[in-house]
Swiss-Prot record:
Pfam family name, one: Trp_repressor
PANTHER family in UniProt: TRP OPERON REPRESSOR
Natural source organism: Salmonella enteritidis PT4 (strain P125109)
Keyword Transcription belongs to the record: yes
Family annotation (InterPro entries): Trp_repress, Trp_repress_bac, Trp_repressor/repl_initiator, TrpR-like_sf
Compartment(s) of residence: Cytoplasm
Subunit architecture: Homodimer.
Gene3D superfamilies membership: TrpR-like
Keywords, comma-separated and alphabetical: Cytoplasm, DNA-binding, Repressor, Transcription, Transcription regulation
DNA-binding region of this protein: 68-91
Keyword Transcription: yes
Family recorded in the similarity comment: Belongs to the TrpR family.
Protein's UniProt name: Trp operon repressor
Role played: This protein is an aporepressor. When complexed with L-tryptophan it binds the operator region of the trp operon (5'-ACTAGT-'3') and prevents the initiation of transcription. The complex also regulates trp repressor biosynthesis by binding to its regulatory region.
């Protein structure tokens, strides 16, 4: 069994606070129509591409028409990335899952 030191807990809390700070910054950027320039500043082209791929993974998992292996081939993503997306989707709050289905699949 691994014990977490108070130091690692403090680091985890600091990282969580930094994440929440970013989320608030992004919320403010949306309110002022500066979200695209902010995201372009904060994310590399590869990171933006990876986020787009993750949206596609979630979309296809919600659609349920392809196996994870087929998704791997179709999207060029690693099977571990697809499995993480699947596991995250399974543990997502029901409200979020319904919202994602409505937003991602409504025009499909």
């Amino acid at each position: 069994m691994t014990q977490r030191s108070p130091y690692s807990s403090a680091i985890a809390e600091q990282r969580n606070q930094e994440w929440l700070r970013f989320v608030e910054l992004l919320r403010q950027a949306y309110a002022e129509d500066l979200h695209l320039p902010l995201l372009q500043l904060m994310l590399t082209p590869d990171e933006r591409e990876a986020l787009g791929t993750r949206v596609r993974i979630i979309e296809e998992l919600l659609r349920g028409e392809m196996s994870q292996r087929e998704l791997k081939t179709e999207l060029g993503a690693g099977i571990a990335t697809i499995t993480r997306g699947s596991n995250s989707l399974k543990s997502a709050p029901v409200e979020l899952r319904h919202w994602l289905e409505n937003v991602l699949l409504k025009n499909a």
